[in-house]
């Protein structure tokens, strides 16, 4: 019985060791084989990872195409796909870097508007709440305006125009938040300045009606009924 137990334990250890070795060899072969794959094969693997939701793996594989086959026809497309995968992973800085690299390397390519849009939407997707620093909103506006001005007939220009209005709404919301605070604290002049910004700079936003109402309220509180 003791011999049988010892044999089973020994066999289990050897099986586990063999499994570890095989897994290690498999991973090693995968890494080595990547160099031997064609650009098309690596691209297919990258797309498969992307579709399955493994954005990090997809981004890495797309980047490998540029490294191994920098002059292939797929290198250009892979760079843009890398930017998209990184954006989906919410790695906005790296995504923008890849998109900017694409624009710099292929300035005349038909997908340059798309690359600009990736940059713009990366900023836009970081506007998550009105209490956040609004610098990111201005960066988004700048990027969207670039698309509208340079590629006015593209689908990206239409989407950018809509996003500009939404970004304006974020900025107006921030001004309203500050204006309400000043009004509550009876700092009427400061409140008036904020509400005027909404009315004059963001007149088409959903916050304009309230801004007008608060502006009148602030003037009445100052006793300036004729303003």
How would you name each of these model-derived features?
Residues 1-25:
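Sec-dependent bacterial lipoprotein signal peptides
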Residues 4, 25-227:
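Acidic, polar-rich low-complexity tracts and alpha-helical solenoid repeat scaffolds
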């Amino acid at each position: 019985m003791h011999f049988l137990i010892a044999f089973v334990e020994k066999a289990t250890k050897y099986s586990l060791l063999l499994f570890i070795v095989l897994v290690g060899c498999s991973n090693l072969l995968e890494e080595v084989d990547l160099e031997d794959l064609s650009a098309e094969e690596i691209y297919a693997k990258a797309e498969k990872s992307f579709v399955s939701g493994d954005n990090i793996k997809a981004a890495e594989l797309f980047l490998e195409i540029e490294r191994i086959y920098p002059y292939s026809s797929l290198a250009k497309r892979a760079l843009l796909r890398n930017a998209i995968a990184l954006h989906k992973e919410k790695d906005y800085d790296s995504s923008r870097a890849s998109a900017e690299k694409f624009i710099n390397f292929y300035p005349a390519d038909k997908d340059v508007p798309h690359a600009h849009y990736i940059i713009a939407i990366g900023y836009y997707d970081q506007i998550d709440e009105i209490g956040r620093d609004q610098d990111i909103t201005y960066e988004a506006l700048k990027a969207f305006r670039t698309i509208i001005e340079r590629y006015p007939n593209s689908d990206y220009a239409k989407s950018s125009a809509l996003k500009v209005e939404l970004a304006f709404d974020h900025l107006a919301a921030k001004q309203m938040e500050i204006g309400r605070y000043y009004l509550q604290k009876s700092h009427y002049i400061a409140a008036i300045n904020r509400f005027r910004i909404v009315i004059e700079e963001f007149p088409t936003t959903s916050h304009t009606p309230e801004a007008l109402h608060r502006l009148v309220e602030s003037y009445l509180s100052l006793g300036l009924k004729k303003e």
